[in-house]
Each structure stands twice: as structure tokens, then as C-alpha cells.
């Protein structure tokens, strides 16, 4: 199409017909003044889109290669733009298709990597790809290194040469000389974690604990000298540690206070050692018989250091008046 004025002169440049703008291309050397149609055209350093009828387009414009966005004056936007409450990036550095919307990819922009959905919207938060997970901040920037997300620690591996920033979910990984342990969902393990060989404990920093740890009011020993499984929790046994014997229950807790075994009761002091002889517990006297492996005496008479004492069924030493059969004792 061409347009001539009333005098028969060929018109070129912008032309408003009704409410619609058209462009008559005076620089078309083969067909000067031909109306631009069904194309993207650079005019005075700006890009414009025209539909098949030649009408200048505004808003979102779909072409075979993807989407563009034009302002109300028809000029394509480039760079970051918030459209309809979402962020898009129209790539002015795309040599083949200038100002084409970035979609369905990771893209480095001014040194920072961003994620874009197939719809072109910038994404934030967790992003899943075939190789695994990445994370982007609320402003869209891909992050690297340690990150606390919803009170859990994750490591986005900046040293992964194939997939920089990929979330680590290996069972263990050495980072800056320290070994850390991760769940399958990528969260750094803190606290107790069970493996086929037994239990381990990771400190709040994520470092596997060795030696003594007090957890929820109980003492545990993580055996750093276990050559096969360093840091494995000691359970259900006695163990000599620094020349002192300690006793551990099936859950690994060091025995403290009353402990029942094979129908007999024993008492372990706060240091983890079995009490022997007389023991006052909460104002009540008990006798842990050193001649019988420190078992608590209960339910009868017992001579201690030449004197007779009576212990009831709970092991408590009787005081004041005591009826035994038809006899009374004091």
C-alpha cells in the first residue's frame, strides 16, 4: 500500500488515519513510500511493530520469535519493565531480535543471574530445573553460598562449574575445609540424624559433634575415636572415657538418677557414676549395696556396718515406728 495526497504526491513517514498510525517508508529503496506491514521496523533509533494491515501496534506483540512490548506511542520498551504487576526483561542487547522478551531461561544481566518463566515473568524463590534446585531473592537475583530460608540452612554451590548456584543435597559435602551434612531436600542437618550404623549429632553450626554433648537435659557421648564411624553415638553399653567408666542406655543417654535393669534398681550420680552405699534422694535414704554390684536394697532387713535397717518395697529406708508381722520396731 501507498498513500498520495490530493495533489498526487507520494506521502512518506508517519500517517494518522482515524485513530490508527501507519508508517510509509520513504527509506525503502526498492519501493519508496510503501506502507510498513507485518514487521518490526527501526525508525529513528526506535523499534516499532506493525500488523498485517499496517497498523502500528501497542502493548504486547507476538511474533514468531517471541514477545515484544510497545508503549502507547508504539516504541518498543527495553530493559526491566514492570507490566501488570510483574517484572519482565526486554533484551535490548539481543543482536538478532532487539528488545525481545526474555523467557524460559536463566540470564545474566549486569553481572547478576535472573530466572524467567516461560511467560517471561521474573521469578523468585525456589526454582527447579532438570539438574536440581536454585534460589532467587525477592528481587530476582540468583544467590550463591549459604542461605537461611524458612529457618533452614541451604548451600547454593558457587563452585559447581557446570551448574553454578545449584543447591547441594549430597549426604555430605566439605565446604571451606569443614564437612557438613544435608538432607535429600537440601536442608543442612542440625541435631540428631540416624544412619544405618547408628545416630550422629550435628551442632547448630552444622558441624558433626564429637565428645560430650548435653541435649534436652541428658548427656550423650559422640565417639570421635571410632575409626570407622567418627562421631557415632555410644549406646547401650559401658565405656571408659579418659579413664572413667560411664554407662549409656539404649537411646545413648548417659545414665543419671534411677535406672532399672534385670529387675533391680541402681542409682547413677550426675557425673554418670553408679552410687554405692548410702544415698539420699529428695530427702529419702536408700542403700546401694556395694557387695551386690550396687543394687538398691528393698523389701526387707539389711545389716549395714553392724546395724540393722529396714527398707520398704520402694527401697526407702524405714524411719520411726515400723510394724513387721506382729512386732513393732523403732
Model-derived features with residue positions:
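Extracellular adhesion/carbohydrate-binding repeat motifs centered on closely spaced tryptophans
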Residues: 1-330
Amino acid at each position: 500500500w501507498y498513500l498520495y495526497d490530493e495533489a498526487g504526491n507520494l506521502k512518506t513517514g508517519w500517517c494518522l488515519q482515524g485513530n490508527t498510525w501507519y508508517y510509509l517508508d520513504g527509506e525503502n529503496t526498492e519501493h519508496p513510500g510503501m506502507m510498513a506491514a507485518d514487521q518490526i521496523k527501526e525508525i529513528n533509533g526506535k523499534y516499532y511493530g506493525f500488523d498485517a494491515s499496517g497498523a502500528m501496534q501497542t502493548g504486547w506483540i507476538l511474533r514468531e520469535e517471541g514477545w515484544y512490548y510497545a508503549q502507547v506511542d508504539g516504541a518498543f520498551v527495553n530493559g526491566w519493565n514492570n507490566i501488570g504487576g510483574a517484572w519482565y526483561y526486554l533484551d535490548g542487547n539481543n543482536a538478532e531480535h532487539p528488545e525481545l522478551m526474555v523467557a524460559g531461561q536463566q540470564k545474566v544481566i549486569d553481572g547478576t543471574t535472573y530466572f524467567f518463566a516461560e511467560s517471561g515473568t521474573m521469578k523468585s524463590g525456589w526454582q527447579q530445573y532438570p539438574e536440581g534446585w536454585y534460589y532467587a531473592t525477592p528481587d530476582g537475583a540468583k544467590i550463591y553460598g549459604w542461605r537461611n530460608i524458612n529457618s533452614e540452612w541451604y548451600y547454593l554451590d558457587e563452585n559447581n562449574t557446570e551448574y553454578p548456584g545449584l543447591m547441594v543435597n549430597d549426604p555430605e559435602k566439605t565446604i571451606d575445609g569443614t564437612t557438613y551434612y544435608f538432607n535429600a531436600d537440601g536442608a543442612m542437618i542440625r541435631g540428631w540424624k540416624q544412619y544405618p550404623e547408628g545416630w550422629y549429632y550435628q551442632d547448630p553450626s552444622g558441624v558433626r559433634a564429637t565428645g560430650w554433648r548435653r541435649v534436652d537435659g541428658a548427656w550423650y557421648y559422640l565417639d570421635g575415636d571410632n575409626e570407622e564411624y567418627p562421631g557415632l553415638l555410644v549406646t547401650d553399653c559401658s565405656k571408659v572415657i579418659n579413664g572413667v567408666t560411664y554407662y549409656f542406655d539404649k537411646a545413648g543417654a548417659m545414665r543419671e538418677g534411677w535406672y532399672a535393669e534385670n529387675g533391680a534398681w541402681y542409682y547413677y550420680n550426675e557425673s554418670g557414676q553408679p552410687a554405692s552405699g548410702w544415698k539420699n534422694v529428695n530427702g529419702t535414704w536408700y542403700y546401694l549395696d556395694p557387695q551386690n554390684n550396687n543394687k538398691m536394697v528393698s523389701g526387707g532387713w539389711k545389716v549395714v556396718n553392724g546395724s540393722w535397717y529396714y527398707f520398704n518395697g520402694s527401697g526407702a529406708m524405714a524411719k520411726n515406728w515400723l510394724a513387721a508381722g506382729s512386732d513393732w520396731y523403732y
